[in-house]
Amino acid sequence: MTRPQAILTDIEGTTSSISFVKDVLFPYARRAMPAYVREHGGHPQVRHWLNQVADEIGEDVPDEVLITTLQTWIDEDRKHTALKALQGMIWEDGYRTADFSAHIYTDAAIQLQAWHAEGIPLYVYSSGSVPAQKLFFAHSDAGDLSGLVSDWFDTEVGPKRESSSYRRIAERIGVPAPEILFLSDVIEELDAAKRAGMRTALLDRLEDYPTPRSADDVGSHQRVESFTQLVL
């Protein structure tokens, strides 16, 4: 099999630890959400996303209700585009004030840089908003890695468990789906990418999944525990 013409990667559980997102980013956004909405709710971009939240719950409600709804969605890990956009805005403040830096596994940082040096285009597809993705890579533990990525995709391109989303990405980057390798820790996402024709690899990191996924669950996906084990 020839080397892929492009690599598409997830972030949480793939390039970076699940615990960083769950234990650092989500709680930070939850704590900061009330003050952020009260202070910036009049900004057109912020109001755009707040209006989407109001549309979702089907009511003309005050901001305090929207704040409570957003915090509940954080607790539920809802993959709602408006929530992800607002979280990204809040995290931008945290990155810029150095309240935290984004975790990235050493093997992922090294391999992403190696693939970039070899001329393999790299793309990111995450449920986090595109601005949040860019901040994540720009403020990583390994330094600014944002320049390695050719383009970014979030749930505005479609849900991550639907094959149509991956077909859309292939069309946008101009690479045939069979020539794209998709990396993720979520089997359902890999299944969707494979149905779209992409090559797939499951990141089954012991740090995130102490009990390895079974062969039945992994199916036809390549299974690795780090980026260094990937066979292109």
Swiss-Prot record:
This is Enolase-phosphatase E1. InterPro entries: Enolase-ppase_E1, HAD-like_sf, HAD-SF_hydro_IA, HAD_sf. It comes from Xanthomonas campestris pv. campestris (strain ATCC 33913 / DSM 3586 / NCPPB 528 / LMG 568 / P 25). The keyword Metal-binding applies. Transmembrane segments: none annotated. Pathway: Amino-acid biosynthesis; L-methionine biosynthesis via salvage pathway; L-methionine from S-methyl-5-thio-alpha-D-ribose 1-phosphate: step 3/6; Amino-acid biosynthesis; L-methionine biosynthesis via salvage pathway; L-methionine from S-methyl-5-thio-alpha-D-ribose 1-phosphate: step 4/6. Bifunctional enzyme that catalyzes the enolization of 2,3-diketo-5-methylthiopentyl-1-phosphate (DK-MTP-1-P) into the intermediate 2-hydroxy-3-keto-5-methylthiopentenyl-1-phosphate (HK-MTPenyl-1-P), which is then dephosphorylated to form the acireductone 1,2-dihydroxy-3-keto-5-methylthiopentene (DHK-MTPene). NCBIfam families: enolase-ppase (TIGR01691), HAD-SF-IA-v1 (TIGR01549). GO terms for biological process: L-methionine salvage from methylthioadenosine. It catalyses: 5-methylsulfanyl-2,3-dioxopentyl phosphate + H2O = 1,2-dihydroxy-5-(methylsulfanyl)pent-1-en-3-one + phosphate. Monomer. Binds 1 Mg(2+) ion per subunit. Pfam families: Hydrolase. HAMAP family: Salvage_MtnC (MF_01681). PANTHER family: ENOLASE-PHOSPHATASE E1. Its EC number is 3.1.3.77. Belongs to the HAD-like hydrolase superfamily. MasA/MtnC family. Its cofactor is Mg(2+). GO terms for molecular function: 2,3-diketo-5-methylthiopentyl-1-phosphate enolase activity; 2-hydroxy-3-keto-5-methylthiopentenyl-1-phosphate phosphatase activity; acireductone synthase activity; magnesium ion binding. Keywords: Amino-acid biosynthesis, Hydrolase, Magnesium, Metal-binding, Methionine biosynthesis.
